[in-house]
Amino acid sequence: MQEQATSSIAASSLPSSSERSSSSALHHELKEGMESDDEIRRVPEMGGEATGTTSASGRDGVSAAGQAQPSAGTQRKRGRSPADKENKRLKRLLRNRVSAQQARERKKAYLIDLEARVKELETKNAELEERLSTLQNENQMLRHILKNTTAGAQEGRK
């Protein structure tokens, strides 16, 4: 009897009980697998909802209009419940842990790339040092040849 009175008050904003039972069951089955972490861990508020809406869990389909009116003002004044604070803290810790793990993975990938670049640059540096040594030896030999050639040409003029 009380459910009929409650549903007639909220009839303008909610579907009829037959629509609610058929469509909400289907809608709930579709939505149930897609609930976010917030929805799964949320403690249902007894008075924080508008008159005639279903309960926060959305599982029973019973209206919470007449049950939670007295605690509506006190719940909002007190702020978050300890369970909500704990859930929020745990969620923050989990996000932080995931973020830290991702940062460690990025750092590891960066260091691997950096080490590969170091090896590449060391190899290139060794090749360049070898080439420098070869060119210096060649330059020294050419200077010696030039010196001998110019010295021999000067003796030939005399």
UniProtKB/Swiss-Prot annotation:
UniProt feature, compositional bias: Basic and acidic residues: 26-44
Additional remark text: When it is down-regulated, plants exhibit defects in light responses, including inhibited seedling photomorphogenesis, loss of thylakoid organization, and reduced carotenoid accumulation.
Posttranslational modification: Ubiquitinated by COP1. Ubiquitination takes place in darkness and leads to its subsequent degradation, thereby preventing to activate photomorphogenesis signals.
Chain spans, region Disordered: 1-105
Chain spans, region Basic motif: 88-108
Localization: Nucleus
One function term, GO molecular function aspect: DNA-binding transcription factor activity, RNA polymerase II-specific
Residues covered by the bZIP domain: 86-149
Organism: Solanum lycopersicum
Top-level taxonomic group: Eukaryota
Keyword Transcription regulation part of the UniProt annotation: yes
Keyword vocabulary terms for this entry: Activator, DNA-binding, Nucleus, Phytochrome signaling pathway, Transcription, Transcription regulation, Ubl conjugation
Protein name: Transcription factor HY5
Gene that specifies this protein: HY5
Region feature (Interaction with COP1): 35-46
Biased composition (Low complexity): 1-25, 47-58
Entry-linked SUPFAM superfamilies: Leucine zipper domain (SSF57959)
